[in-house]
A protein has these predicted regions:
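Small-residue hinge/turn detector
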Residues: 211-212, 238
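Acidic, metal-coordinating catalytic cores used for nucleic-acid/nucleotide bond scission
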Residues: 58-68
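Short, glycine/acidic-enriched loop or turn micro-motifs at the edges of active sites
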Residues: 12, 63, 87, 220
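Long, charge-rich intrinsically disordered scaffolds of nucleic-acid metabolism proteins
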Residues: 81-205
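Gly/Thr-rich phosphate-binding beta-strand-loop-beta motif of the actin/hexokinase/Hsp70
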Residues: 2-21, 109
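Anion (oxyanion) recognition and catalysis
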Residues: 74
Length: 293
């Protein structure tokens, strides 16, 4: 079956769409980033898709704005690919694209899909997506709590102040502290409801260095990698997905830069893995000590 690629540049309010099949390319307009807009896109695609092609959506991850659209695409049984924005930018430069507009970006995504034929991705399991949201909310609460505690520490060193300001900071600390306990209890209860996640957490926790602070983030990351590669990924690809693959820069004998990591993946997971490795190195019986030495 032939494939009809849809390149979509998605923003908070709307998105631009371009179709590409064989040698035919067509911009089909701008649509609202909401269920009505998704339906209007479907109507426009159906008018073009007279040969009953397989639909393959190509879009860049844009915070959370793309999530509703991607869920809709899976409901329509479309194939979906979410290439790394850095990869798309570099690919576009290689194609000689010098202009950046929403319409050009949609054109680039459709052309990338048509020429590179990226593998379709699976959707992330709903219960993993919900766990991920709770983990992110916990991080947000911890950040707000830390900020308020820093404000309190700064406040007590002031020579002047007000009782209202002091009490407001104390109230905020109490509020965020209670919220943190609540979301932690919710995560614990959620894992009891989903024994598959609980068992996988136990297995990951057996790896030296992976503790309670990072194990669930790493578990979600592995699920996301599995979905991104349709369960066909390998170890090298996983390392690259985290942005830990080596970035070499040398040419003959005249050009050489110290190798670094690419940092093209999720910076949060790199921080989590770094802290896990650091913790693993501190344990006397950890095999990481012998490995690194």
């Amino acid at each position: 079956m032939k494939t009809l690629f849809i390149g979509c540049d998605i923003s908070k309010k709307d998105f631009e769409a371009t179709l590409r099949a064989d040698d035919v390319e067509q911009s089909i307009g701008t649509f609202k980033t909401n269920p009505h807009g998704y339906g209007e896109l479907r109507k426009a695609v159906d008018k073009f898709n007279k040969a009953d092609y397989q639909i393959h959506l190509i879009a860049e991850p844009t915070g959370t704005y793309h999530l509703g659209f991607i869920a809709y695409a899976y409901e329509q049984e479309w194939e979906v690919s979410l290439p790394n924005p850095v990869v798309i930018r570099q690919w576009a430069k290689g194609q000689g694209v010098r202009i950046k507009t929403d319409k050009i970006d949609a054109h680039t995504l459709a052309a990338y899909g048509f020429k590179e034929q990226p593998a379709a991705e699976n959707s992330l399991p709903t219960h993993v997506e919900e766990l991920d949201l709770m983990l992110k909310r916990k991080d947000d609460i911890k950040k707000s709590l830390r900020q308020e505690k820093n404000r309190l520490e700064s406040y007590v060193h002031r020579t002047t102040g007000s009782d209202a300001t002091h009490q407001s900071i104390l109230d905020a600390i109490a509020f965020y502290g209670a919220q943190l306990l609540e979301i932690q209890a919710a995560i614990k209860s959620y894992l009891k409801q989903h024994q598959d996640l609980a068992k996988q957490r136990t297995l990951l926790s057996a790896v030296p260095g992976i503790g309670e602070q990072g194990v669930l983030k790493i578990l979600v990351f592995l699920y996301r990698w599995d979905a991104r590669t349709a369960s066909l990924g390998n170890a090298n690809g996983l390392v690259a997905f985290a942005g830990l693959d080596p970035a070499l820069h040398s040419s003959s004998t005249s050009v050489y830069r110290r190798p670094t990591i690419s940092k093209m993946g999720d910076s949060e997971i790199r921080r989590t893995l770094y802290m896990s490795a650091f913790g693993g190195m501190k344990a006397k019986s950890s095999p990481l000590v012998d490995f690194c030495q």
